[in-house]
Amino acid sequence: VRNREHHDTVASLGAHRVVLPEDFVDAGPYDGGLELVGAPSWPGNIQALATWGRIMVIGVGAGPKTELSLVDLMQKRGTIRASTLRSRPLEEKADAAQAMVRHVLPLVDAGALTVPVEATFPMAEAEAAFDRFAEGGKLGKIVLVAA
């Protein structure tokens, strides 16, 4: 978590360990990880991967192309998987939505899973909401409320 001010809050949400990005590799090894930054993270991801570790690529916001040492991955006996909803057929998207309804929403309803909300805005203030979304330092969702 980039912002030290958010570490306690992230820990209270259930994180086993909270580290700064620059400490990520040294704080490993990790059994698994979700990758959503992309190319700049790859050298550290492989270095911090535990033996038999897994990486699931779900985003490439900072770039999709990288160089990867297959020998390093082989020595870790690691696994890389990748997925995106965008290119899936409508039926698969519907299945994913139904799985959320079955498995995740009951946890939200029971209070076992919470989603941090940074700020709420009425729909009429959508531009201000987008501006807040574009700012750094958030911990949580920016929510537009329809009246």
Identify the role of each PLM range:
Residues 31-34, 54-57, 115-118:
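Short catalytic-loop micro-motif centered on adjacent basic/acidic residues
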Residues 23-26, 88-90, 122-123:
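A short acidic, often aromatic-flanked loop/helix-cap motif at beta-alpha or helix-coil junctions
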Residues 10, 40-112, 145-147:
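Glycine-rich phosphate-binding loop and adjacent beta-alpha segment
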Residues 1-41:
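Adenosine-nucleotide cofactor-binding segment
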Residues 16-19, 115-121:
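Structural signal for short hydrophobic segments within the conserved structured cores
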Residues 105, 110-119, 127-147:
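C-terminal capping/lid region of NAD(P)-dependent oxidoreductase domains
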Residues 8, 43, 127-130:
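Generic structural signal for individual residues within well-ordered alpha-helical segments
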